[in-house]
């Protein structure tokens, strides 16, 4: 029996020297901290420094991460490095291998250390091999981001003498910083034991951010009574109140941000389930520029680097702010790595009671609108500045969130074909067809009231395929296209999408199939101002729902013989009456209900969602297949800091006198999954995600670079559920 791997004690994989950096997932938080500590040491060694003889920021980060450790290994490691801190000289970080210590405030501008240029020369000499090793190195901060964890900020700027006229002390063409980080959009598949695969999705984008239109928070009332005043237009209601903020949201919570169409095809064709493991993101190579216009005619715009302007960054790691996933509005980061993208302006809902009564005094009357306004008991006005730590970055700086580990249930990449009529043992047939291709074979051979089995029919002895008792309820019945009233207005009730209805018509949403509308950043081929966005309907394969357009329910005693009065059909729900009787429609989502999770929708669908802070929680969320059981990754907010002029007067106007400033920065992230390879259990081959010759050209650019991303199915492989 092996007790040690290198010098690692039992129960750990990374806590100790001499271990491999490829031992799989850490066993506990202390082991995870040790893994990041080892990776930082490896980075130091590659740069020519010996961290074993010095106390490094990586050691300090390990001390901070294990200060509350309850396991014996974490406690020993914590006090070991505290002792090292007391006796060992301090090792400074390099820009290529930044600190893993807690965030530090920017200080004065400093010259780059000489070893930067030595390392650059070494890299150039090492060639492609060194570049490959750099690409495989961890992000500049691998710090675990626990609930309430702090991100890491690195400030490393070079001295540059400005020769331009940029505002705010900006420089011209002088040195503006040292390049940091790498641009990586590869998806790495690592095949592990027992049929498991580790999928590491890397994503990078150039993000453009203008300064906000206003530095103020604004409460905006939206009221489109011109449309809802017309009878029958309740579904056009847009009335609400929102808080518009000066911040923007960097949202990577969409499948298209992380996977290209070829990657997704490989995943859905070869794997049966996905587990969401971890997420980290970083901002680096920050550039801030000012814009001025010359006095000549016609005026000429002049752009200058501003080395003293700031980019404000805030990570809501505790999720104290309203959770606003942008995929539901198609406003995440763009799906094309080679195209610059923009973050979405951040806003959130504000409480505002209002009642819409869709009744009329006459045939031409208008609905009754009752506006109650905001209840003083429900006011919640959030500002980032006093709720979340804000970091100030200047040209060349970077910001890393650390690693967030998910706690989510897995997501299946298969669909079920079994409904209640296909569960259990089929009836015994006394005779079988004797000729090939015979149809309408209906002879079971035993009289219906003489059969054996179990039913829940109290007034009849008939045992049929309709009356035999099944083990559970597959899917659930829900009102189709139903609107409900809330204190803030009507809303469409969400339902789980399922097979049924107009399944071949991708222009109609049948049985709750989600329908997506999106623009050029997210898959639309061409766009002009005011053009209708492109759309698609994701047709679910799951039998998780029923057939709401054709639902019927037997809700009265079963009598013999069955008469027309007791048969409920879609077109004749009650004998002699027309139209559906909604009092007979009910929801069977109860303790006997079997229901699958929603499918991942590539590329526009949301990946993870936040769990509701309620005592009774929904078992599913319609928007995303992964629901975080506890905390979820903190939202990342950015904002160009006010760059004021000497004419600023706080009493003169609500609008500040500002220098026009914008920022370009690079964003990169890493999203890790674990997947299970799909085993084949059937004789027959199955349908897989593929394309025909015509569809192939949808994924290719045309002669002016226009292209589109076509949505791909994610649950084509069938499976039985019982």
UniProtKB/Swiss-Prot annotation:
Pfam families named in the record: Parvo_coat (PF00740), Phospholip_A2_4 (PF08398)
Q: Where is the composition biased (Gly residues)?
A: 161-178
Name the Gene Ontology biological process terms. Answer: clathrin-dependent endocytosis of virus by host cell; symbiont entry into host cell via permeabilization of host membrane; virion attachment to host cell
**Which GO MF term does the entry hold, naming one?**
structural molecule activity
Q: Which UniProt keywords apply?
A: Capsid protein, Clathrin-mediated endocytosis of virus by host, Host-virus interaction, T=1 icosahedral capsid protein, Viral attachment to host cell, Viral penetration into host cytoplasm, Viral penetration via permeabilization of host membrane, Virion, Virus endocytosis by host, Virus entry into host cell
Q: Where is this region: Phospholipase A2-like?
A: 14-59
A single GO cellular-component term on record? T=1 icosahedral viral capsid
UniProt region (Disordered), positions on chain: 90-115, 136-179, 497-531
Q: InterPro entries given for it?
A: Capsid/spike_ssDNA_virus (IPR016184), Parvovirus_coat (IPR001403), Phospholipase_A2-like (IPR013607), VP1/VP2 (IPR036952)
Q: What does this protein do?
A: Capsid protein self-assembles to form an icosahedral capsid with a T=1 symmetry, about 22 nm in diameter, and consisting of 60 copies of two size variants of the capsid proteins, VP1 and VP2, which differ by the presence of an N-terminal extension in the minor protein VP1. The capsid encapsulates the genomic ssDNA. Capsid proteins are responsible for the attachment to host cell receptors. This attachment induces virion internalization predominantly through clathrin-dependent endocytosis.
Q: What is known of its domains?
A: The N-terminus of VP1 is sequestered within the mature capsid. It contains a phospholipase A2-like region and putative nuclear localization signals.
Protein family membership: Belongs to the parvoviridae capsid protein family.
Q: What is this protein called?
A: Capsid protein VP1
Instruction: Look up and give the organism this protein is from.
Output: Mink enteritis virus (strain Abashiri) (MEV)
